[in-house]
């Protein structure tokens, strides 16, 4: 696992890995905006699709509704890119519209994956100023742990396009002959409207409740419920250094 404290660092490595793709590229993002970041990625996706690479994109229809052209899906398909919109917004609001896809996932050949808080928009790499200097973080994952990201993407893809595609041909071992070197355990996870379980919240509560020395939370959105607040307070009472860092001008799209 490699940690990127800044979006521009994450972007540089992402571009490098996308250019190395030989079998498939899966990308799933909440926000896509036209600009330097997206134009760079789109050029690679189009080129790789022409080379025979399986290139797929999932985007959240609400998150992208103000930023992409109305013919976006048609344009992508003309470039050879398979595309699916998560939960398209309609003229009539209902509670189902609250289900949004906030994932930021890229999987390349099932062996390299990227995730974190970085969407595909220029402010995330500080090519565009919005609310001052923009800080979001990301991670690059390599090896068998990437399978979790691959399966999350494919489960969402199958749900959107109503497919029953077999996942096995996308497993890392299918495209990487060398044995994986393991020096620890990495398990990416994700929430989904399909799960009917608050996976993320349960993991956070477990981490807080088991903390012995400190809990440091870094987030632009500090909106916690009573159970989470109680866990943090109890940890502090037990001598754990419980600190949450947030921004005074957290944005909302």
Give the location of each predicted region.
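N-terminal localization/anchoring segments of enzymes in phospholipid and broader phosphate metabolism
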Residues: 1-202, 206, 210, 234-237, ...
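Glycine- and other small-residue-rich loops at beta-strand/loop junctions that grip anionic moieties
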Residues: 30, 220-221
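Conserved small/aromatic sequence motifs within transmembrane helices
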Residues: 197-198, 217-218, 224-225
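Conserved small/polar residues in nucleotide/adenosyl-binding loops
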Residues: 246-253
């Amino acid at each position: 696992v490699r940690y990127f404290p800044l979006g521009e660092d994450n972007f540089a490595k992402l571009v490098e890995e996308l250019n190395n793709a030989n079998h498939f590229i899966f990308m799933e993002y909440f926000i896509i905006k036209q600009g330097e970041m997206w134009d760079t990625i789109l050029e690679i996706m189009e080129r790789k699709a022409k080379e025979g690479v399986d290139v797929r994109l999932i985007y959240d229809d609400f998150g992208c509704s103000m930023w992409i052209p109305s013919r976006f899906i048609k344009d992508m398909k003309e470039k050879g890119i398979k595309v699916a919109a998560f939960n398209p917004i309609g003229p009539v609001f209902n509670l189902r519209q609250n289900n949004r896809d906030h994932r930021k996932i890229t999987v390349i050949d099932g062996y390299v994956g990227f995730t974190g808080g970085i969407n595909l928009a220029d402010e995330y790499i500080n090519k565009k100023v919005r609310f001052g200097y923009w800080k979001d973080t990301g991670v690059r994952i390599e090896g068998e742990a990437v399978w979790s990201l691959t399966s999350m993407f494919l489960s969402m893809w199958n749900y959107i396009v109503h497919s029953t595609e077999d996942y096995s041909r996308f497993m890392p071992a299918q495209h990487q002959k060398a044995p994986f070197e393991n020096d620890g355990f990495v398990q990416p996870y994700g929430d989904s409207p399909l799960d009917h379980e608050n996976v993320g919240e349960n993991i956070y509560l477990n981490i807080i409740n088991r903390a012995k020395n400190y809990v440091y939370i870094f987030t632009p959105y500090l909106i916690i419920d009573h159970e989470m607040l109680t866990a943090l307070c109890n940890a502090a009472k037990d001598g754990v250094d419980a600190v949450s860092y947030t921004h005074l001008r957290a944005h909302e799209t």
